[in-house]
Amino acid sequence: PGVRRNERLPLLVMLHGCGQDAEALAASSRMNLVAARERFFVLYPEQDRLSNAAGCWNWYDTRSGRAQAEAGSIDAAIRQVCLLQAVDPERIALAGLSAGAGMAALLALRHPDRFRAIAMHSGIAPGVAHSSATALMAMCGQRAAPISPERLASEARLPGLLVIQGSSDPVVAPSNGAEAVRLWAARGGAKAGARRIVQRGARYAAVITDYRSRSRVVATLCEIEGLGHAW
């Protein structure tokens, strides 16, 4: 978007899923059109195929340090964009699809004060996987044990979370979306409000549940009826 003198605009960081690249996510999400209309910057980091042949972010590989290294590279890219463009550092948000959602969650947990909000689309709840095998199990809705909310982050307040999950997702079990929201809500002392159904025209209906702590929305679960593993 055209930036006026002394103006600072928000930044949205979009993280692609497996088998995608930055260009594919930009095209499927049409986020550039939204950014031009609503006036914000978009950054599309791209996974190195030498790091993962399928183009997946290694969000789960925290034991070897690969996940943290990739998160650090993305964070460095964000810092660089903030130096080069008129970005408002107080209005930076993360969004990710599938493996990108897992990496977005990791970034938010590592830097809870850096980001205003995070959106996880068809992703895995943070902390439930630490290897490719456990990641695949989590995708199928299997996990060894529930994760304690206290393990998520330090005492810093987590950024607001939006989880988008399709009810017909054949890749990531819908229970993962609910688990991510459960962890975020428990960590923030939030309670679920009444579910509401939103449908616009012939689009898929969305069942939305807000989790609030007093007046603040800590997390929102958006379950889209009939949606598969797609933006």
Predicted regions and their residues:
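Hydrophobic anchor at the start of a short beta-strand
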Residues: I92, I118, L161, A219
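The conserved beta1-alpha1 loop
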Residues: V13-G17, S122, Q165-G166, E225
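Serine-hydrolase catalytic machinery in alpha/beta-hydrolase-like enzymes
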Residues: P1-V3, E7-A93, L97, G102-R116, ...
